[in-house]
Amino acid sequence: MTTRPATDRRKMPTGREEVAAAILQAATDLFAERGPAATSIRDIAARSKVNHGLVFRHFGTKDQLVGAVLDHLGTKLTRLLHSEAPADIIERALDRHGRVLARALLDGYPVGQLQQRFPNVAELLDAVRPRYDSDLGARLAVAHALALQFGWRLFAPMLRSATGIDELTGDELRLSVNDAVARILEPH
């Protein structure tokens, strides 16, 4: 039997909070890299340096873990948006959340059912509702604005090439997308 060096043992998470945090981090990284379907519970356990039984103990099924990762990313993004975090940190968090969402959706996971909380969407709805005569109008406006943002985040390289706007800088494109989102969120 081989024993692990002491340095490896020190890096292993201990205690409920550390173990849960390590599992969430590992699952988030792996889901962003390759998607939930291509990631096994054993992969997550190995990356987080815990026994795979602990993944089940802390999070239940893989579907529940996907939901926990999405909730974790939403909460983390909300905290960043309310902090003094630099724009590049927020941008990386948005990108990571978008990647996990896209991969989970493409893998066939029912993201809208697995994720329990949508704090950023709730805040946006609260801000937009007073501008609309109906709740449905506000909800549709927010859905359209999010779809536009997700579309650009995921398909920007293809959209730039297909429409001949490769020469726009990232900042110019971001301003244009933000202007379009603002128009969507304002009733006509």
From Swiss-Prot:
Keywords: DNA-binding, Repressor, Transcription, Transcription regulation
DNA-binding region positions on the chain: 40-59
Signal peptide: none
Keyword Transcription assigned: yes
Presence of the UniProt keyword Ubl conjugation in the record: no
Domain of life where this protein originates: Bacteria
A GO molecular function held by the record: transcription cis-regulatory region binding
Gene Ontology BP term (one): regulation of DNA-templated transcription
Induction pattern: Negatively autoregulated.
Domain HTH tetR-type: from-to ranges: 17-77
Outcome, altering residue 62 to A: Abolishes DNA-binding and repressor activity
Function per UniProt: Negatively regulates the expression of sulfate ester dioxygenase Rv3406 and its own expression. Binds specifically to the inverted repeat sequence of the intergenic region between Rv3405c and Rv3406.
Comment field (misc): Was identified as a high-confidence drug target.
Domains: entry comment: Contains an N-terminal DNA-binding domain and a C-terminal ligand binding pocket.
Protein name, as recorded: HTH-type transcriptional repressor Rv3405c
Taxonomic lineage of the native organism: Bacteria, Bacillati, Actinomycetota, Actinomycetes, Mycobacteriales
